[in-house]
């Protein structure tokens, strides 16, 4: 028996040494099947999510896999009419949402968090094929963190009456997010907004809209009151339409400094509350004497 154990150990060590020499990567355990099936179920085309329903896809543009440059799906370009419809839906949803107690609202946030955990493998693959980041980053960091944000703010929602006495919700929040952390950035913005009793209109980056649309479907599955969360896809023109809506009480924007300056000019004197997170970068400095394999990891 001891001899057999030694043989197995030496074989494994030989494999490990060979692996370090080659530095090849095995295929990730996560496959694309479930994510692609979800896209296929929508016939490869997506409308906006307004008032608890997906609209008919129109004014379509392609979303591309940055790894192989192949088309993943077609997304709708949001128009001024779409934004106005989402404002109407958010206004209606706001009344229903604020009629609930903070504790009742927290139960929806907990449900969202649990659903993200349940669907984390599919969401991770969807984010990786659309954003281009490694599956390890989306699976082990971004998506679990997104779920944790909803858990965290669900807890705060339960304590609103005790810890935030005399505070009141802002109202309708317009939120614009970039492509680098699609679902995590969504969680950063949506979770605290709805926990505090607001309704939301979210515009994801045009390059990475699929996880936001998947999130919208989660909201529908858990029975979140219609209009509390709305997702309108499109480019900067769509975002501009949103910023100019008088009924939107707060704009939260993450993106370039140039666009942030324009938003500040547009909203100046309007009474809108404004949160700007501008010009963020994720630099990685590698010198010529670095271990390149470790740097890639």
What are these regions (language model features)?
Residues 1-74, 107, 111, 144, ...:
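Terminal low-complexity tails and localization/encapsulation signals of metabolic enzymes
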Residues 52, 69-70, 105, 127, ...:
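Residue-level signal for inorganic ion chemistry
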Residues 69-160:
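Glycine-rich loop-to-alpha-helix module at the N-terminal edge of alpha/beta enzyme cores
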Residues 155-226:
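Conserved small-residue-rich beta-alpha loop and adjacent elements
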Residues 191, 250-254:
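Periplasmic-binding protein-like
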Residues 198, 203-205, 233, 254, ...:
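Short beta->alpha connector loops at strand-helix junctions that form conserved
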Residues 230-249:
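A structured beta-alpha segment of the ubiquitous adenosine-cofactor-binding alpha/beta core
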Residues 258-297:
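ALDH superfamily catalytic-core signature
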